A protein has these predicted regions:
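N-terminal extension/subdomain marker
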Residues: 1-36
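Short alpha-helical hairpin
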Residues: 34-54
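Basic- and aromatic-enriched surface patches that contact anionic nucleotides/nucleic acids
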Residues: 58-185
Length: 185
């Protein structure tokens, strides 16, 4: 039987790592958002995801098993209380996740259908993803799709002539649900 660690979902590739000290004196922004929408977590959709980083010193984002990932995504979709993700903005304008990498990565995984085996992960691991990681990702995807549904299904429900009524209500709610942010200086 595999160890518990081997059953955890590896979401480490979903937030780029960067030296916490990396800095450039070009930051002039003083206003910061107070929450992140799920649409900001899509690849190539906006400014947030390309700017977000995880400090090199932080642990790997691979401590949650499939059930915990599913439960968190379900809690978000249902509009339940989610603790704030703590962020810090560098002088270069990079956004570092100080606390909440697993929460943020789980939502990025859902929005992009990458549970450690797709676009982000393939790029970071240069196409070399271990078979056990692929299997864990597949199992996680199946559980998420069964218990929550695919992110793309929620998007499709908004324009469908005959959507699933429950999915449609949740899709409409996702327009106003966001992950809260706390900024530190």
């Amino acid at each position: 039987m595999p160890s518990k660690k081997n059953r955890n979902v590896n979401l480490d590739a979903l937030i780029q790592r960067e030296d916490f000290e990396a800095s450039d004196e070009n930051n002039t922004s003083t206003s910061k958002v107070s929450s992140i929408s799920i649409r900001d977590m899509k690849i190539n959709n906006g400014f947030f995801l390309p700017s977000v980083r995880k400090p090199d010193f932080q642990r790997e984002t691979a401590d949650w098993d499939a059930e915990k990932v599913v439960h968190f995504i379900q809690s978000f979709v249902n509009g339940e209380f989610i603790p704030s993700v703590i962020l810090w903005r560098s002088q270069a304008g990079l956004i570092f996740v100080i606390d909440g990498s697993h929460r943020l990565s789980s939502l990025i995984a859902w929005a992009n259908d990458d549970y450690g085996d797709k676009e982000f992960s393939l790029e970071v691991y240069e196409g070399e993803i271990p078979n056990d990681q692929k299997q864990i990702a597949k199992t996680t995807r199946e559980k998420v799709n069964k218990e929550v549904g695919q992110y793309s299904d929620y998007i499709a429900a908004l324009s469908s002539k005959h959507p699933d009524p429950e999915v449609l209500v949740k899709a409409r709610n996702l327009a106003t649900i966001a992950l809260p942010i706390q900024w530190i200086d």
